[in-house]
């Protein structure tokens, strides 16, 4: 099963997303957004910028 992004509202009624692996484990969580459109933009940013992201120890 492929991973998926889930959009939900938090306790403050803000939109957030979480990325779940194929096994259902949450592997990433986005910040709070005022609008669903902003949340969707955050998801698109992750999709665009992360496919070949380097792993860097800081």
Swiss-Prot record:
InterPro entries found in the cross-reference section: DUF1508, UPF0339_domain, YegP-like_sf
Highest taxon of source: Bacteria
Family: Belongs to the UPF0339 family.
Record-given protein name: UPF0339 protein TDE_0826
